[in-house]
Amino acid sequence: MFEEINLGQPIELVVGITGMESLTAETVTKVRKAWTQSPERYESLFNQIEQLTLSGLECLKTGKVEELGELMNICHGYLNALQLSTPELEELVHIARSNGALGAKLTGGGGGGSMIALCQDNKDAIEAAMNKAGYKTLPYSIG
């Protein structure tokens, strides 16, 4: 089910692309195996990510962009705890945050690929820093 949300203001984003590829099926298999070995830990992480997602939706509906960024940062930590991040994704997340991103997290199936940074007025600086480090970027606005 999709729900149209009136953002009230444009949301500025930069996608950082590692150039690495990973197969979602392999990532799912890896997480499933870890989950069977420690179900309580993984169920807790899954539940926390679900709650962050619902809170993030409320932030979008109410225009709380800074809070959304904080939730993205927390979510990335949980995704990292699920062993879905890579050194390259961690570098991109660090670059984004150290250049003023409100939030940054991996996106997609994990294991490589891409991350997304929530920006304000500093989208160009974040993109330039990622490019300088050798990564491709895709800047865009929503709303």
Descriptions of predicted regions:
Residues 1-104, 116-143:
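C-terminal nucleotide
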Residues 112-114:
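Glycine-rich active-site/cofactor-binding loop and its immediate structural neighborhood
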